[in-house]
């Protein structure tokens, strides 16, 4: 039987493999519960592609775990939530993205946890909320909501009002990701604000379909407005 260290090496070899399509399939040859730890480590990797492949891998592994034993998958989801809690002492890098990816691939987990993901971008005047103040974490939450919206727009729709506020954020990546999410939700009430961003040439990076690409807020705003019909 492979040791935890051996499995971590195997997981990272797959995440770093030039043939990632094949690597994804090989993840299932490993004991899934022992894959989870290395995947959490991958979310902090200095190589952005390894981090994003880790996110993708979570979306493969945890739904498979849920189908076999729902409580084991819930434990993983609760670990993400704890990592984003101030009391955890950690940062929670990659946690919102992984949550969104998992929920896009498993309806029951999405039903249980989508509101938690959406509330990460909801700020109240009292401050009694789970709003993520760190812009990089908030980017992750908006990307996660956009990924959820790709598969389950009706669940992501609860974030519509907060996403419209994000369209005015000073962070260009947040503005672009909000457009992506709102377009997928088909949020007609966001049309006028997104139309204002059609001339926003700010550059940003976007992960999707297994690749990191460069795009602009303008491109994402234009696509989102077009999606509204």
Language-model regions, residue ranges each:
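N-terminal alpha-helical scaffold/docking segments in eukaryotic complex subunits
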Residues: 1-66, 215-229
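Conserved hydrophobic register position within alpha-solenoid helical repeats
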Residues: 23, 54, 95, 141, ...
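Histidine/lysine/aspartate-rich catalytic loop segments that bind and position anionic ligands
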Residues: 114-152
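Hydrophobic/aromatic-rich structural module bridging two neighboring secondary-structure elements via a short loop
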Residues: 69-100
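Structural signature of alpha-helical solenoid repeat scaffolds
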Residues: 59-62, 100-101, 142, 146-147, ...
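Short coil/turn segments at helix-helix junctions and helix-capping linkers
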Residues: 41-49, 82, 86-90, 165-173
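Alpha-helix N-cap/helix-start positions at coil->helix boundaries
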Residues: 17, 33, 48-49, 89-90, ...
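Amphipathic alpha-helical scaffolding segments comprising HEAT/armadillo-like alpha-solenoid repeats
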Residues: 2-9, 30-42, 64-81, 108-124, ...
